[in-house]
Structures are given as structure tokens and as C-alpha cells.
Curated annotation (Swiss-Prot):
Gene name per UniProt: pag-3
Region Disordered, annotated ranges: 253-290
Pfam families: zf-C2H2 (PF00096)
GO biological process, one term: regulation of backward locomotion
Provenance organism: Caenorhabditis elegans
Highest taxon of the lineage: Eukaryota
Protein name per its UniProtKB record: Zinc finger protein GFI1 homolog pag-3
Length: 336
């Protein structure tokens, strides 16, 4: 049997013509009518088969003519272009052939390939008082606080500062011994840590890899970027325990104490600890009229957060204390 004959047998026109031929004229006998009469169920089955074959013909034509989509993630949440998978591509063609998705290239559905995936923005409103890390849920914050419960076992005998790891203590002892094993290849200046030497080389190369997402200003060190972002947010995490004045940098708080409260011991708390009485379980709550935030809009108004600032990585909050410790270390070296 030839291919042309097979296509004619299973075409929509041939099926519908068979249905028309099966109809019985009124002049035929009852026996002939019963013999050749097609019931409604049989008629509907013929029509369903005709519709199915019509759909298959459309799919075959679309598969031969339409180009496959590029590997683009149209939902923005999957790590691969799932429409390139055969099962999803067939489902998309079937929906287009049935008229569920229009074939007009100017329509929003057809232009789905040109959409740019938008990464989801995760807001972390819960703030740790001790290390300034941010978390999205209270449960994550409570789990993190267990880190601060454990005692620090390694203590520096010269200054009394304690550490959780012996490696951190060994690095700290280099400050007291003034051992600087890492020299700069450009100017010869030596540093205690290799990371400090690498940051220093940015001065010679002019490289500024850390860029502010709000104003576009670039910095050579991440600590400078973290301090800079506080100007946009108005966030002042360091507070004087004597007068309550808050500062964006730890070094500014220390200078304030030396000039305004020279007789008091060096015991300052963070701004989050001042507002701990206003928040449940000691979680940081921005200062408002009643001590709590009524809405997300009030949260944005308190911190003066522009929309672009929400895209800043939460990891920057994890580096805040490390950056301020670097400033404190530099100040100690300059004083000594």
C-alpha cells in the first residue's frame, strides 16, 4: 500500500466522507436502515477520531516548521531550560495547536522566549544582636544563636581576647609579635595575613571589584562597601552605652567615647541591644512609636531602603563585624 493511499485513508476528509456515506435515506427498508445505521455513539467516535487526526496533522506540521526554543528558563526558578525536554516541548506544541496558546508572535505567550528571568529576592528581617547576621525566619535565627552560646576556648594571654578556633588565635598572635610573613610584590610592605596583602594590592592595580548596587560606586575592599551601604540604609549598629548615640562604624564609636566619655570603661553595646527590651526574645526591632513595625512599608520608611537595596546580597551582613574588626585592628596598630 502506497504512502499516499495511507494518508488518504486516515485523513480528516476521508473520515468525514465515510460518516456521510453511512447515513441512510428515508426510502430504504428498516432492515437496511438497521444494518447500515450509525448510532450517535459511533458518530461521535468518528468525529473524535477526525479531530484527533487533525490535531496530529497540526502537530506534525508545527514540528517540521517551528524552531525549537532556546534553552531559556521562562519561570525564573528552574536551573535549566525545561522546554527543551521532549515531553514539555510536545505539550507546548499541543497547547498551541489546540488554540490554548496563540500562535501570534506578537502575543505575550509567544514572546515568552524573550523574557529575562528575574531572580527571587529574599528579605531577611531577623537580626542577630551579637554578630549582625540576617535571617529570613525566627527558627533560623534561634538555630544560629546556639553558636554564641558555646564558650570560646582559646584565649590570648597578652590581651585576653578569646577565640573559638586555635587557628584564629594563631593568626591573632601575629599582631602582638609583629610577624608579617606576607610581603606586597609591588612595594614590599608586609602583612600579617595573606588576605590583607591581597586587599592591599588593589591599591597598586586600581582594581575595585566591590560595587554598590544603589549608586554604582566601586571599592577595592568589601569592608568599605559595607560601610558605604549604611549611608543608603541609615543603619547605625553601634551605640554608646553611656549616652545612647549610635554610629555606623565601630571606630567612630570608639573615638566618640575617647572624646566625650574618657572616664568610663570601654564597654559599649550595639544599637540592637538598646532596643532589645522592645522586641520579643531579644530580636532586633527598629525604633518606632510602639516598639514594633506594623507593616513592611513602615519597615522601609524606618531604614529608608530604596527598592534597589533589597537586591544586595545577605552575605554582606555576615561580613559587617569582620569589616569593623579590621578597622579596630588598624586603629590599635596606629595608636601603639
Amino acid at each position: 500500500m502506497s504512502t499516499e493511499h495511507v494518508s488518504n485513508v486516515y485523513s480528516v476528509e476521508s473520515l468525514l466522507s465515510n460518516v456521510e456515506k453511512s447515513s441512510v435515506s428515508p426510502t430504504e427498508s428498516i432492515e437496511d436502515r438497521n444494518e447500515f445505521m450509525i448510532t450517535e455513539d459511533v458518530m461521535s467516535s468518528w468525529q473524535r477520531m477526525a479531530a484527533t487526526i487533525s490535531l496530529q496533522q497540526k502537530l506534525l506540521m508545527m514540528q517540521q516548521t517551528m524552531p525549537r526554543p532556546p534553552p531559556v528558563n521562562i519561570l525564573g526558578n528552574f536551573p535549566f531550560g525545561f522546554l527543551n525536554a521532549p515531553m514539555f516541548w510536545q505539550q507546548y506544541l499541543r497547547s498551541m495547536a489546540m488554540g490554548i496558546i496563540p500562535q501570534n508572535p506578537e502575543s505575550p505567550s509567544a514572546s515568552v522566549w524573550n523574557r529575562t528571568p528575574t531572580p527571587p529576592v529574599e528579605i531577611k528581617p531577623f537580626h542577630c544582636q551579637k554578630c549582625t547576621k540576617l535571617f529570613s525566619t525566627i527558627a533560623a535565627l534561634e538555630q544560629h544563636q546556639q553558636v554564641h552560646v558555646s564558650d570560646k576556648q582559646f584565649e590570648c594571654k597578652q590581651c585576653g581576647k578569646t577565640f573559638k578556633r586555635s587557628s584564629t588565635l594563631s593568626t591573632h598572635l601575629l599582631i602582638h609579635s609583629d610577624t608579617r610573613p606576607y610581603p606586597c610584590e609591588y612595594c614590599g610592605k608586609r602583612f600579617h595575613q595573606k588576605s590583607d596583602m591581597k586587599k592591599h594590592t588593589y591599591i597598586h592595580t586600581g582594581e575595585k571589584p566591590h560595587k554598590c548596587t544603589v549608586c554604582g560606586k566601586a571599592f577595592s575592599q568589601s569592608s568599605n562597601l559595607i560601610t558605604h551601604t549604611r549611608k543608603h540604609t541609615g543603619f547605625k549598629p553601634f551605640a554608646c552605652d553611656v549616652c545612647g548615640r549610635t554610629f555606623q562604624r565601630k571606630v567612630d564609636r570608639r573615638r566618640h567615647r575617647e572624646s566625650h566619655h574618657p572616664g568610663h570603661p570601654e564597654e559599649c553595646v550595639s544599637a540592637s541591644q538598646i532596643s532589645s527590651d522592645l522586641s520579643p526574645k531579644g530580636y532586633m526591632t527598629p525604633p518606632t512609636s510602639n516598639g514594633y513595625l506594623d507593616s513592611s512599608d513602615e519597615f522601609l520608611n524606618v531604614f529608608r531602603l530604596p527598592a534597589e537595596l533589597l537586591a544586595i546580597k545577605a552575605e554582606m551582613g555576615e561580613e559587617m563585624e569582620e569589616a569593623d574588626d579590621e578597622e579596630e585592628k588598624v586603629l590599635n596598630l596606629s595608636v601603639s
